[in-house]
């Protein structure tokens, strides 16, 4: 995952479970680098602060904590989750390009997320309730993104 300040961490447990190829690991690292480059963490903190202020004002005006609770739930489904999925899709696209420019096969991002999807099969929730795109959406988007950056990969890899 990516943390504020551009630091990254990769779970060794995940590495041990999916046993990624070098190209797949480059897809993970590229994805996390993209989050740092686009400052997604900073944006999420700012949005959360604005949401909390708005909910506090709403609660104070209405005098009802339940209103703020409902507002928080609606805000999450209508703004926070879709924005998080947008960040994930953007990080996927940029990450694939970064990996390709470094000489790693961008098509490996598709196989990586297929492996990840297999780990969580049966526990997937509807996309609109998730912080991440669905496996089907992600696979389609990554396939298209990989095709676009194949020339960069071929140039970087000398193919």
Residue ranges and their predicted role:
Residues 1-159:
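A Zn2+-metalloprotease active-site environment signal
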